[in-house]
Amino acid sequence: MFAPLNTKTEYSFLDSVVKVDDYLETAHRLGYQTVGICDVGNLHAAFRFVRKAQKFNLQPIISIELNFEWRGLPIAFSFIAKDTEGYKNLLRISTLHNYGRRQFSDIQNHLSGIALIIPETYGSLSELTELSSVADEAFIGIDQLTDKGAKFNLPTLPFPAIRYLNFADNEILAILHAVRDGVSFDESLTISSNELLQRPEAYETYFLKYFPQALKNLSALTAKIAYQFDEKLELPRFDKKRQAVEHLREEATLGLSARLEEKNLLTEVSSVNLQDLSVYQERLEKELSVIHQMGFDDYFLIVADLLRYAREQDIYCGMGRGSAAGSLVAYVLGITQVDPVQHNLFFERFLNPERVAMPDIDIDMPDDRRAELLAYMKNRYGSDHVAQIVTFSTLGKRQALRDVGKAFGMTEAELSNLTRMLVRRFGTLADEYENNQRFKAEVLKNGKLKRIYEVARRIEGMPRQTSTHASGVVLSEESLVNYVSLKPSEDLALTQYEAPDVEAIGLLKIDFLGLRNLTIISRLRDLVKRRQKIDIDPLKINLEDEDTLALFRAGNTMGIFQFENPQMRRFLRNLAPSKFDDIVDATSIFRPGPSQFIPQFVARRHGKEIVPTVDDSISEILKPTYGIMIYQEQIMQVAQAFAGFSLGKADLLRRAISKKKGSELEKLREDFLDSASHNGHSKEKAEEIYDLIERFANYGFNRSHGFAYGALAFQIAYFKAHFPDEFYEIQLRDRKREVMILDALENGFEIEKPSINLMKIGDFVKNKKIRLGLAHVQGISRDLAKWIVENQPYKDLADFVEKLPNNFHKKENILPLIQIGAFDYADSNRGKLAYNLADHANLLNYYSDDIFMASSGGGFAYHEAEDYSETEKYDFEKNLLGIGVTPHPLQNLARRFEGNFTPLAQLVKNRRMTILVEINYIRTHRTKTGQTMAFLTVSDSRENFDVTLFPEIYRQFSGELEQGKFYLISGKVTERNDELQLVTDRISPALETDRKLWLNLRDDKYNQKISQILREFPGSHQVILHYSNLKKTIQTKIYVEESEILQKRLEGYVIAGIYK
């Protein structure tokens, strides 16, 4: 029977549209019994293909196509693995090829268990016969286009290439080839249909008729192919001279003594201490027993050794994270810095003897020192025993559109116009087409664009090239090439299998996570030590520090890991955390799912809502979180306390619910109800508690992880509370600079005016004053910045230009410095300096080498010119520095309209409020009914914000809207996608004007009603009240728009009202 052995999958990058799952499903449906893959240049899909084929009861056959030079000829050989030995030789051959070994003689010793396929182009070469003696078998691969009268010097084998599964995909393949080759797609070219997977009968009929022996050869070959994969975990030995179980026990015992000494449990003997001591010792014994029983002794020694090396090199790796923080062994070995006994964290959540799985210890490290730890692993275990893991860059929606559009001849301008319409929140092109009306309208403009969209949608998500997994590293006892093909990479070799496959074949995977926040802590520590002569050990920071807790209570958490979101900051202000556990709760509940319980959580914390008692047996478990199961550990405790489950079994229940494992879940549910009954609970109560567990198990967060990451956030916040200068200087290097500068300003910092004599290369912060750095000035190269700092000071602009080397003697190198005010100390008229620079009086030419250098010596005579306006100065600074140093025009308006608007940072959901803002961007949108509405992006010089104008309001105010202008905008504050926005009903320009609204009243009888009406019409005109009976006039702080509707609303309450 025919078998498609030469199927190229999508991992033959841009050379096939065949997805592995689709291929197996189609082959099964068409009646195949045997299927193969033969990707070009790699084995990325091999292991996954074998496992999935077996689920379809299909016989899988693995092969690979590689170019090797044989007798001076570059030949695209295909290598079929006939058995397990052949599969391992495929791994070796592929690895050798990846490392540049491209001579056939380089692989001749690795052809056992291999069937060699030679392209029919070389089938008549007499020397081919010698290849049959090198490999187990050698064949000439033929297909339907092979000359039926051809004579070959080796046996033949049906080997047609398969690159698509549906006939319509042949065009997609042709376009993919155009993308791959960087050429335009030519529709006039005939598209071949012989690479379509057909029914087996079609191939059999053809080959029986023309090449019957080839079909027999295929049947004989496939009949003897089978693989046996040993998927048993093969952990590398940490120390081949010692038994790992003894070594681990010794290290853990010593580590426990050291940890207990830190807690004074060994030095201060008392009955309480002895009781605590026994808790630690018993738990350590229990954990060591489970670790050995599951075969992970070496694993713990390997990870502990790596963390020990990190400490020796002063690489701060944080507190540890994830469920590993629940292990006492991990704590005493220094893998984590969280005491699981003290904080009631569970080992079973990490390593469960009732659930056989690899322990998952993720190692966090500063991202700028990750390479050092990779190098240590390479040197410690050998370069052929350690590798990073491959991942794939796939065709995203933007790239897919660009690639296909280019193949169809679109210009760069057209491509940019099309891709600019894409919106990030819509994940795929199909989502864009469904939800982005502007994009859909563009696509439907003509048939060509519609076709480009359809093709791009089909190839979206396909792998385009390899990349390196952000964190995964694998280790093996034997050489890795016995398990997986490798390719060279920057730090370590790179596996050809992705992470799930690497773990499935029994390799140890450790995640080396480079965290920017650990880099920030390390840099903060270094800067504080250098400046303040204080060495802050992050692990010794008091997690109950009151100044730091006050920072969280105020929601002053910009720059703090996991606490920067505006909604999180608002939540913190409502929560008012008073202890570190509150911080852990906050980061754990503020997630999709459990965040729905935040209002109850806050209300119960402050006594505004009663905490329900579901059952006395679990009330103490839920008491710390006010009756809400935030944590997975609580779910396990409830199952243990209520139904008598072991913690291991409780963890199985939690996992079964969260992963929705049907049959397993049903059995565990019955076990829970039965066990609860044996514990004396009624069926009704047991079902109530089970339903409660089921509800929260979908949302529950790992408290071990929450504690470790809460501690990391607290450590960063400690520096913000106690060393704010150093905090902001480091954050300005590593974060969104504009955001952090604004945060510093809100915390009482000032920005120093730029001065060419005082600026450094980078930003500098001291005594709550920020000196912006030259490296951040747009248009100033690092080399120029370095020269400026090395040659300070300068008397004035002329002195600076005179000293400037010829290679920097350009207007574009100097004008930005004038425009940010770097020479204001000598002459504050920036307009005059810019005027004289080059365009008119040619200050640059005056100080060039060949002009005027022998002048009379009186110096350059400046021509007078008008200075920039304050708004122009602000705009130049904003564009060139990222922030305006000159007061923003809105600040003057804010003083004028104080009390008439609410700052963006203080908006409250579901309230009608007025904001004073600048319009940055106006986007119109046509509704399904054909009406036009608008979305505005506005800012108050500190924060950006979204404003929505529905059609009726847009019609009313569209003529007044202009980007770059200032407005008072009123409406209802709502929430969308977890972000606040304003749905407006009134817009009024914010103007500096002397025109006022004068209201004449008899007395103050209607003051409250008048004030209420006036505040519905915010605008630029100050309200003046004259009381005729009281003979007094009051200048109010209320400003209103000029409006006939307002005047009509005031009728009956005032004698007269006039604008003048």
UniProtKB/Swiss-Prot annotation:
One Gene Ontology term from the biological process aspect of the record: DNA replication
Enzyme superclass (EC): transferase
Catalytic activity of the protein: DNA(n) + a 2'-deoxyribonucleoside 5'-triphosphate = DNA(n+1) + diphosphate
InterPro entries membership: DNA_pol3_alpha_NTPase_dom (IPR011708), DNA_pol3_alpha_thumb_dom (IPR041931), DNA_pol3_finger (IPR040982), DnaE2/DnaE/PolC (IPR004805), DNAPol_HHH (IPR029460), NA-bd_OB-fold (IPR012340), NA-bd_OB_tRNA (IPR004365), PHP_dom (IPR004013)
Main localisation: cytoplasm
Family (UniProt): Belongs to the DNA polymerase type-C family. DnaE subfamily.
Its biological purpose: DNA polymerase III is a complex, multichain enzyme responsible for most of the replicative synthesis in bacteria. This DNA polymerase also exhibits 3' to 5' exonuclease activity. The alpha chain is the DNA polymerase.
Name of this chain's protein: DNA polymerase III subunit alpha
Organism this protein belongs to: Lactococcus lactis subsp. lactis (strain IL1403)
Gene expressing this chain: dnaE
